[in-house]
UniProtKB/Swiss-Prot annotation:
InterPro entries on file: Kelch-typ_b-propeller (IPR015915), Kelch_repeat-containing (IPR053256)
Kelch repeats: 123-170, 173-222, 224-275, 276-338, 341-394
Residues passing through the membrane, by range: 18-38
Localisation per UniProt entry: Membrane
Pfam families from the UniProt entry: Kelch_4
One biological process term in Gene Ontology: anaerobic respiration
Membrane topology term: Single-pass membrane protein
UniProt keyword Repeat, yes or no: yes
Keyword Repeat part of the UniProt annotation: yes
Lineage start: Eukaryota, Viridiplantae, Streptophyta, Embryophyta, Tracheophyta
Record's GO cellular component terms: endosome; Golgi apparatus; Golgi medial cisterna; membrane; trans-Golgi network
Name of the protein in question: Kelch repeat-containing protein At3g27220
Top-level taxon of origin: Eukaryota
Keyword annotations of the record: Kelch repeat, Membrane, Repeat, Transmembrane, Transmembrane helix
Amino acid sequence: MANKPDHHHHHHQSSRRLMLVLYFTSVLGIGFIAAFLCLSSSIPSVSAVFSIWVPVNRPEIQIPIIDSKIVQKRSKQSNDTKDHVRFLSAIFADIPAPELKWEEMESAPVPRLDGYSVQINNLLYVFSGYGSLDYVHSHVDVFNFTDNKWCDRFHTPKEMANSHLGIVTDGRYVYVVSGQLGPQCRGPTSRSFVLDSFTKTWLEFPSLPAPRYAPATQIWRGRLHVMGGSKENRNAVAFDHWSIAVKDGKALDEWREEVPIPRGGPHRACVVANDKLLVIGGQEGDFMAKPNSPIFKCSRRREIFNGEVYMMDEEMKWKMLPPMPKNNSHIESAWIIVNNSIVIVGGTTDWHPVTKRLVLVGEIFRFQLDTLTWSVIGRLPYRVKTAMAGFWNGYLYFTSGQRDRGPDNPQPGKVIGEMWRTKLKF
């Protein structure tokens, strides 16, 4: 008879093997732990090593949800900024607009930034301005719309401002009020002058009560009105409003105070239309001279742009009208009046919130005076600020200013003297 298997003995041997395995595993584990503790006491901790590359408790940074390619160092901002940089919001976008056919004309004799102009009949008088930040012009160039040629040039008075002028014409006499004298961010002058455009002679005119940079300037109801601008340090906002009676290039009385403008600042369009005085766009604050700089080197300061429209009527009270489609500045000479509408070309708008760079404007805006409504009626060949506009025989002209760096980069680039025209149809 065969013997039965001894199950109890087999189970006892298996238990002993398991206990031996656990024993040796435990000994090895204790050895590894001891070695690790010994080693860790003589070298930096893991977290300390990693902190060289990843700071501990680093601050949380809020970044808009956009393509990382547009977050670039300002000092290395490339010229091929992607299209979507310009479409973070409506303010920074190129507003959709009809494409216009542009014809390039004869360029101005010199490039100009912050130049100023007036149109008298078929002649566009272009005044002074920067050739570069280190050089300013002291002359007037004249363009003849009939011949489409630059036809004349003459000097301005030595004491007259070179940029940031207040300027207006009555159809013969050109009133030039205050402004900046010299290059970079030099100080302002209150000296004012009158040009007789028929004889090309200059006349003295009473100085403004205080010097101003780029004040809004117009002739309304027989009085020369000067409003806002920047104060003596170039950055502080001025709200002053003065007027003086004028006729045939002469002052008939003295400067007097008027109702201050509700929102001050420089670089605005100032228009008289339908017996109303309008002030459009502009900004608060501007670049100012760097402290102790012997050349008054321009230093960036905070600028707040706006597209607000203020109107003064027969009651001598300011009223707000609908604002521009987007904030816009540097448009002092960038407007014309045609078909009961104000047309404004180009300008500069709010700083880009990511790159912190200036954004130029490339649209053409129309403000209909009968309906008080704004529209975008076209696009310029490129974005440009401080352009100077004229209108003749159905054509809208613009010349000079500072253009962008290309179709996909709205930052300010080259100072130009180019002139273009397009047929206006509306």
